A protein has these predicted regions:
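Polar, glycine-rich mid-to-C-terminal structural blocks
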Residues: 234-238, 249-307
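Short coil/turn linking the two alpha-helices of tandem helical-hairpin repeats
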Residues: 166-167, 173, 235-241
C-alpha cells in the first residue's frame, strides 16, 4: 500500500472540503441584492392588505396568487361566502344551480366540515386574524397618532372576524398577538368566553377610533364599533345564555344619532355611487380598475327576483 498517497491526499481533501463548505456558507449569508425587495415591515402596506382582505381574494386582482390554495379563488371572498352562509339557508334567497356541490346544499341548511364554503370561510377569517396579529406585533410600542389609530382599526377588523366565527361556528380556536408562534393546535375558546373577548376589545378601542364619518371612506370608525356591539348584544342570548336587548338598542341608537338612516330608495344601495347612501356605516370598497374580485355583491334586487 502506498502510504505516501494517504499522507498527502487526505490533508489535501480536507483542505478542499473546508474551503468549499466555508464558501457555501458565505454564499448563503448575503444581503439581498434585489432593490425591489423590502425586508423591513411596511406598516401602511400591511394595513392596506388587512382592509383589502375584506374585498379581494389574493394579490393579483380578480384571480391569481390567491390567499387560499386549492380552491376556486373567486368563490373564496369574504362577502360572497358570508352571503351564501347567511342568506341561502333562509327563505330570503336561493341558488338554484344544483351543479355547485358546495353552494346548493346550503339552500337546505346542510352544513358539513367538507363543504367548500364552510371550510373556506373558516380559512378566510383566520388568514385575516393572522394578518391582524402580525400587524399588532410589528407595531407594538408605536405611539404616534396614525399608528395608534391604525392599531385600533386592526383590532376592530380582528373583532369583526371573531364575530363572524362566533356566529357561524361557535366554539373556535383562539389566537391573538400574545399567542406563541410555532406549529401547534390552538386551544378552542367557548362561545361565551369569545363573546366576552369581543365585547372587551370593542369597548377598549372605542375612544381610540375616529368619530363617526370622520375617517377615510372605507375605514372603520366609532359608528362601526357601536354597530358591531349592537349586533353582538342582539344575539347575546344565543352566545351566552343571557339576553342583552337593552344594550343592543342602546348602541343601535348611538348609530342612528350619529346621522345614519335608511336610504329613501332601497335599490340605491346597489348602485356604483352608493358611497352617497346614508346607510353606509362600514362599506367594503370595490373598484373596477384597482380593486377587482369575483366575490363582490354587484346584484340588482330588481334582476334577482324570481316571479
Amino acid at each position: 500500500m502506498n502510504t505516501k498517497f494517504f499522507k498527502y491526499i487526505i490533508p489535501a481533501l480536507s483542505l478542499v472540503f473546508s474551503v468549499n463548505f466555508t464558501s457555501c456558507l458565505g454564499d448563503l449569508d448575503v444581503t439581498p441584492i434585489d432593490p425591489n425587495l423590502n425586508v423591513e415591515f411596511d406598516q401602511n402596506a400591511n394595513f392596506a392588505k388587512i382592509y383589502a382582505g375584506l374585498a379581494i381574494t389574493g394579490n393579483k386582482g380578480p384571480d391569481g396568487q390567491g390567499d387560499i390554495a386549492d380552491t376556486d379563488e373567486g368563490a373564496s371572498g369574504l362577502m360572497r361566502m358570508l352571503f351564501n352562509l347567511n342568506e341561502l339557508p333562509t327563505d330570503e334567497a336561493i341558488c338554484a344551480w344544483s351543479g355547485d356541490v358546495d353552494v346548493y346544499p346550503l339552500n337546505f341548511a346542510k352544513f358539513t366540515a367538507s363543504n367548500g364554503v364552510v371550510l373556506n370561510m373558516f380559512n378566510r377569517l383566520y388568514i385575516q386574524i393572522a394578518q391582524c396579529n402580525n400587524f399588532l406585533i410589528q407595531t407594538e410600542g408605536k405611539d404616534d397618532e396614525e399608528s395608534l389609530t391604525q392599531r385600533a382599526e386592526v383590532r376592530f377588523i380582528r373583532a369583526l372576524d371573531y364575530y363572524y366565527l362566533i356566529d357561524l361556528y361557535g366554539n373556535v380556536p383562539f389566537v391573538d398577538e400574545n399567542t406563541g408562534i410555532g406549529t401547534y393546535v390552538p386551544e378552542r375558546i367557548t362561545r361565551a368566553n369569545l363573546y366576552t373577548y369581543i365585547e372587551k376589545e370593542l369597548k377598549e378601542i372605542e375612544p381610540q377610533m375616529k368619530a363617526p364619518r370622520a375617517n377615510v371612506y372605507g375605514r372603520a370608525d366609532q359608528a362601526a364599533v357601536w354597530m358591531l356591539l349592537s349586533r353582538l348584544y342582539l344575539n347575546a342570548e344565543v352566545y351566552t345564555g343571557t339576553p342583552q336587548w337593552s344594550a343592543a338598542a342602546e348602541y343601535a341608537k348611538k348609530v342612528m344619532d350619529a346621522g345614519f338612516s335608511l336610504a329613501p330608495n332601497y335599490g340605491d344601495n346597489f348602485l356604483a355611487d352608493n358611497n352617497t347612501s346614508p346607510e353606509m356605516i362600514l362599506p367594503i370598497c370595490y373598484d373596477g380598475v384597482q380593486t377587482r374580485s369575483w366575490s363582490g355583491l354587484s346584484l340588482s334586487p330588481a334582476l334577482s327576483v324570481v316571479t
